[in-house]
Amino acid sequence: MPINLPSSLSPDSWPFDLELLTPPAYLVGGAVRDALLGRRSHYFDLDFVMLTRAVKTARKIADRTKGGFVLLDAERQIARVVFAGGTVDLAQAEGGSLEGDLLRRDFRINAIAYNPFTREIIDPLDGQTDLRLGVLRMISRSNLEDDPLRLLRAYRQAAQLGFAIEPETQSAIRELAPLLSRVAVERVRTELGYLLSNPDGVPWICRGCEDGLFSIWFESAIDRFDILTKIDASADKLAAIYPQLGKEFGHQIRDTIKTPLLAVAKLAILADSDPTMAEAQLLRLKYSNAEIKSAIGLLKYLPQLQAKPIAEMSFREQYFLFRDVGIVFPVLAVLAVAAGVAVEDISLLINRYLDADDIIAHPTQLVSGNDLMEYLKLPRSPRIGQVLMEIQLARVEGRIATREDALKLAAELVDVN
């Protein structure tokens, strides 16, 4: 029977006219599920199942709306239209019918369809009951075997929706966990990224480790659950004391890399505590150089913050710490607190970091390499870089303060050598 779904599913809110769809066409998957749960998103992600002409319809929509057309799978007839605010995917029904297509999906809550022409819900597996119960229940074990990434997706969706995983489904996931070795690491990394970025993701990461889902990539992750499970609370604690620091926890490593700093901190703790081993693990998952470098910096310096009182760190040690960890220092502070370092102790470094004029945390050059070459009449060489480093260290240790001091020291260093 016709129903009143939230306005987010009304064709009036879509980036194209309903008349551009060739009936029968059905909205399926997450958009329907989230509408029934009353969940809203600023980014739309609409998936349609069609019995015929899926790719042609996608191309027609793209042409009429000036959207971007992407052919995702010519053989299975799947195409995407890209808009500024989201995406619309159109796919030919697998199994030759809507019901056949729904029966091939992962979980019952994702096997609900909506007919926008009749405003009817089609729910052959009673996924709406699971929505009311707040559970993820597999459609069949064989569906999970067909695409083992669905094993990880269960944990991600449980975290995302605040749902539980039904016991029989949980048991099947544990048994099928070794099949994840067949999945492209890029797909695994995407699902793990969702969990790392979700404030409710850590308990599900821990359960996933216990159930064998991550043992292929992170063999010893369980050993550091004591730190991992305290990261979010430690971040909240520091953000309450240092609001400016807290704002940076969600910053991306780079504009082109969407991983938040706090997610990198969690990733570092999942990886081996030995930086060399951790680097190999992260390379295997094809993380970017920036993500790997950041995680390794955290792993390198966290033990140092635990080993002795921070107040006993020399200016030289502090300088190299800030230089090496760079923009991920805010989450190094989080990891330190999660690992048992007192907030009062780490505050020495936090205050330096938050002071833009602090020459240890944010050093500036008294002289440049060109200045040295001109003043000392030296050619370009690695020695110039070495002298610049000695000047910087002398400055942070309070032995020099001006440009003249720097040039005098440079001359002395060159004469000595």
Language-model regions: role of each:
Residues M1-N417:
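Catalytic cores of the polymerase beta-like nucleotidyltransferase superfamily
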